[in-house]
Amino acid sequence: MRSFCCCFYPAAVALHCVLLFYTFFLLFRASALRRRVVSGSKGSAALALCRQFEQLSASRRERAEECRTTQLRYHYHRNGAQSRSLCAAVLCCKRSYIPRPNFSCFSLVFPVGQRFAAARTRFGPTLVASWPLCNDSETKVLTKWPSCSLIGRRSVPRGQPKFSRENPRALSPSLLGEMR
């Protein structure tokens, strides 16, 4: 069972890191693209670009609302011509309205990633992953996390005593000869 855990845990951590990397990579690329367009211009031009982004997102919201009202209006009328026009209206709205993610609060959630994305747009973001280490028997402090990392754990199992003078059974004869 121990060998299974030793193989499974690093594979799970690696898979988790890969998934996190691709998620943040896509988010950073979209955010960096928007930032690159705005940062290319200075002063009032950048402010105008930000306003244009806001107007585009507002117009997308309005089109989505029009689609919803159109769908509700024609929901109860089911004859052939109206259903065809409804399908055309829905397809038109679906083509024109493409939801885009909003990254306005993204810097609050992951400020380190924002700095890396701004500095390293060519090579992509640098993912900084951290997780709690296992509690050590010397510190006598329990972590509040139910699952902890294997980093920092001793190679000797915790049930076996350490080499000490108080417990002579734990010492091998060769070590006893070296200590004298």
Curated annotation (Swiss-Prot):
Q: In which tissues is it expressed?
A: Enriched expression in the embryonic and larval nervous systems. Strongly expressed in two large neurons that project over all the lobes of the mushroom bodies.
> Which residues belong to the signal peptide in this entry?
1-32
GO BP of this protein: anesthesia-resistant memory; behavioral response to ethanol; behavioral response to pain; cAMP-mediated signaling; courtship behavior; learning or memory; long-term memory; male courtship behavior
Where in or outside the cell it occurs: the entry states: Secreted
Q: Taking the first listed entry, what is the main subcellular location of this protein, grouped into a coarse class?
A: secreted
Which positions does the propeptide occupy? Answer: 33-35, 152-180
Keywords from the named record: Cleavage on pair of basic residues, Developmental protein, Differentiation, Neurogenesis, Neuropeptide, Neurotransmitter transport, Secreted, Signal, Transport
* Designated name of the protein: Amnesiac neuropeptides
Naturally occurring in which organism (per UniProt): Drosophila melanogaster
Q: What is the lineage of its organism?
A: Eukaryota, Metazoa, Ecdysozoa, Arthropoda, Hexapoda
Name of the gene encoding the protein in the UniProt record: amn
